[in-house]
């Protein structure tokens, strides 16, 4: 790719970013758009409507300053530890690429430019130069300047590992601090017990009560048996949906003509429909709750956190297949459809998910091959000779080779996060947070494989096959293929990174949906949705740009300023979104950080493998041998971090649990907490529904037709 094509891509995306910034600064101040750009502040009642109509139409950047103001403590209080972990991931990346950027731009880039392996740089016409002239490919074989790159690789590796250690330790301590500062929660006192053995003449509830009463007599408190309620839940969801429609349906004004016309009995019709649904739901609840209809699983609660932890980690039976225990999620985080599926259905679902992921990976190679075809202008002219005249136009060729490939790849990637979330939901996870973590992990490795490896090895299928059949050649193959795609990934960072981050700020899809809904029906100011943060979509994106920056920092240092600008935009925009848009739906307690840590370690090892292959190709034998221990030390460092910090992420230490239990003895709210703990894990589909059929006619029309408890 020529420098002119990159400049064209940068120019187009810079204009889009400025346009989105201006539009956001104006549209966010319009009252009708508050539900799109400020739903969380509306829900909290912390946003005042503007009285100055003129100021609403003047672009302002005050929101940027406001997004910098909240401290980390305030962010944790409002968005939980997951929000803090996400922002720490971005600040970690900023530190890494500020350090790598200084080395890359001020040291490595000048060294690459003054090489003469390819051709002499045309200083008179910078835009006509190839981007390869700014990469390590411009250095000759056995060039002594390659030792500068060798030193840079060691420096960045040590710097990143030190940062990873301090960040892992910081998040682990924050996890303990968050546990100390939080109020007592049901999941801290509860475990999930599965594979409860059948007992003649006893129900599942009696079996659980007798077993834990005998074996955990000093700590056992209560239990809730789980039922299969998938069919019943669909009926309840329909009733709730109808209730919302009736609740927000505006009453029809009576006119003289309507007074003499046939009576409009819409309210009575809906009330009768809801009453019929209520009756069906009650019958369904009675049927599901009948003896013998239970799932052989239960949520078992204890009087203390230490008692729950002891029961969780201790084998409960001589037969290891019975009384299996695992941590209980938050009550509102439970994925209830998981319990309605049989063992065979779960087993088949896991196999189906594996095949679906493989199929999606294969299908995604189509846009990758298309993208690579667009970046090769001579190949396009050869395959489509009738386009030669159009492709000969400089502006058209720059747009096709510099902007269009990244745009196609960006659009294709939009379907991956929701698809992976759906696949994870049928895989057999007991809570929504586990579904998000599983989807996040799938999206990370899907992106790395299909966007990175499939792109760099897209020359031919036989080329990929030769890499698989001869693993020893992987570093050499990477050293050849990865630098060749440097120009594409620079354009990818500009197109996907910058523009995607700005579209996250502008919330294009919710804005369009809101505009269309207002066009067809009047909007209710009190009816809006506060969305949760979609970590499975945004975390892989940030991590992938981190992988690109680490991999290319010594190969093509020109990518580093664009990566750094992306993380600056991400820092400002995501802080703004946490303040104004997203509200936490659940909190994993920082469990996304190990995933982030392992991905960064993979990025380092990948960079080191490419460096070993590159120095081998450049005939730098001594440098190659000196680099071989580097990935070994990196993996040993990762193992040290895993042994040192991961136990805190899997279980809380005994001293932490006992300290909190002692503090609870002096807490006057604990009796009320224990009363609520008894029913905290009751299935929402089994909660009672009530219609307001009593009272006068006017009361029945003005009061809610259906009331229900929310969990």
Swiss-Prot record:
Principal location: membrane
Alphabetized GO MF terms: calcium-activated cation channel activity
Transmembrane regions listed in the UniProt entry: 2-22, 89-109, 146-166, 351-371, 403-423, 443-463, 488-510, 553-573, 595-615, 620-640
GO cellular component terms given for this protein: membrane
Membrane topology term: Multi-pass membrane protein
Keyword field contains Iron-sulfur: no
Subcellular localization(s) per the UniProt record: Membrane
Record key words, sorted: Calcium, Ion channel, Ion transport, Membrane, Transmembrane, Transmembrane helix, Transport
Assigned protein family: Belongs to the CSC1 (TC 1.A.17) family.
Annotated PANTHER family: ERD (EARLY-RESPONSIVE TO DEHYDRATION STRESS) FAMILY PROTEIN, PROBABLE MEMBRANE PROTEIN DUF221-RELATED
Function of the protein: Acts as an osmosensitive calcium-permeable cation channel.
Protein name as catalogued: Hyperosmolality-gated Ca2+ permeable channel 2.4
Organism: Arabidopsis thaliana (Mouse-ear cress)
Protein's gene: OSCA2.4
């Amino acid at each position: 790719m020529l420098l002119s094509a990159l400049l064209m891509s940068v120019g187009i995306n810079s204009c889009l970013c400025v346009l989105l910034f201006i539009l956001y600064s104006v549209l966010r101040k319009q009252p009708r758009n508050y539900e799109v750009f400020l739903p969380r502040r509306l829900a909290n009642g912390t946003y005042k409507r503007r009285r100055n109509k003129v100021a609403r139409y003047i672009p302002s950047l005050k929101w940027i300053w406001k997004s910098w103001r909240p401290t980390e403590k305030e962010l944790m209080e409002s968005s939980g530890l997951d929000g803090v972990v996400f922002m720490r991931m971005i600040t970690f990346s900023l530190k890494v690429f500020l350090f790598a950027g200084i080395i890359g731009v001020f040291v490595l880039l000048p060294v690459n430019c003054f090489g003469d392996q390819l051709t002499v740089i045309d200083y008179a016409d910078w835009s006509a130069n190839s981007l390869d002239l700014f990469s390590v490919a411009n250095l000759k074989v056995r060039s002594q300047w390659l030792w500068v790159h060798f030193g840079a690789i060691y420096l960045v590796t040590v710097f990143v590992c030190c940062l990873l250690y301090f960040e892992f330790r910081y998040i682990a301590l924050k996890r303990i601090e968050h546990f100390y500062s939080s109020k007592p929660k049901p999941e801290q006192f509860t475990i999930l017990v599965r594979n409860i053995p059948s007992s003649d003449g006893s129900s599942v509830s009696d079996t659980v009560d007798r077993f834990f009463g005998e074996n955990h007599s000093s700590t056992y408190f209560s239990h809730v048996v789980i039922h299969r309620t998938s069919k019943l839940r669909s009926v309840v969801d329909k009733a709730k949906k109808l209730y919302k429609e009736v609740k927000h349906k505006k009453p029809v004004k009576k006119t003289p003509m309507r007074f003499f016309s046939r009576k409009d009995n819409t309210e009575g019709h809906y009330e009768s429909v809801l009453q019929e649904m209520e009756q069906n739901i009650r019958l369904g609840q009675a049927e599901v709750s009948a003896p013998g209809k239970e799932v052989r699983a239960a949520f078992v609660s204890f009087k203390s956190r230490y008692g729950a932890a002891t029961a969780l980690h201790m084998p409960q039976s001589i037969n290891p297949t019975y009384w299996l225990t695992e941590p209980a999620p938050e009550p509102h985080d439970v994925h209830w459809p998981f319990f309605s599926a049989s063992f065979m259905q779960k087993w088949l679902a896991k196999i189906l998910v594996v095949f679906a992921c493989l199929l999606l990976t294969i299908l995604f190679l189509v846009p990758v091959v298309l993208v690579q075809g667009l970046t090769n202008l001579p190949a396009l002219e050869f395959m489509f000779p009738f386009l030669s005249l159009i492709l000969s136009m400089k502006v058209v060729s720059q747009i096709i080779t510099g902007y269009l490939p990244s745009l196609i790849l960006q659009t294709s990637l939009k379907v991956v996060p929701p698809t992976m979330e759906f696949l994870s939901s049928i895989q057999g996870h007991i809570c929504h947070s586990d579904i998000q973590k599983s989807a996040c992990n799938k999206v990370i490795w899907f992106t790395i494989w299909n966007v990175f490896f499939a792109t760099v090895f897209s020359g031919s299928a036989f080329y990929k096959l030769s890499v698989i059949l001869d693993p020893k050649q992987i570093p050499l193959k990477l050293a050849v293929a990865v630098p060749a795609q440097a120009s594409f990934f620079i354009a990818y960072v500009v197109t996907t990174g910058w523009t995607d981050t700005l579209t996250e700020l502008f919330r294009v899809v919710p804005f369009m949906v809101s505009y269309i809904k207002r066009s067809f029906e009047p909007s209710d100011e009190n009816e809006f949705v506060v969305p949760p943060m979609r970590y499975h979509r945004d975390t892989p994106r940030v991590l992938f740009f981190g992988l690109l920056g680490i991999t290319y920092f010594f190969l093509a240092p020109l990518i580093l300023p664009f990566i750094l600008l992306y993380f600056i935009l991400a820092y400002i925009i995501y802080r703004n979104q946490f303040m104004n848009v997203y509200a936490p739906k659940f909190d994993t307690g920082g469990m996304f950080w190990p995933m982030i840590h392992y991905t960064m370690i993979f990025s380092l090892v990948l960079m080191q493998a490419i460096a070993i292959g590159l120095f081998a190709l450049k005939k730098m034998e001594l440098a190659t041998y000196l680099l071989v221990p580097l990935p070994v030390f990196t993996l040993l460092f990762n193992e040290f971090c895993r042994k040192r910090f991961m136990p805190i992420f899997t279980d809380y230490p005994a001293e932490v649990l006992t300290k909190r239990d002692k503090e609870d003895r002096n807490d006057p709210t604990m009796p009320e907490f224990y009363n609520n703990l008894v029913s905290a894990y009751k299935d929402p589909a089994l909660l009672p529904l009530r219609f307001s059929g009593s009272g006068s006619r006017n009361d029945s029309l003005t009061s809610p037709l259906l009331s229900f408890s929310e969990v």
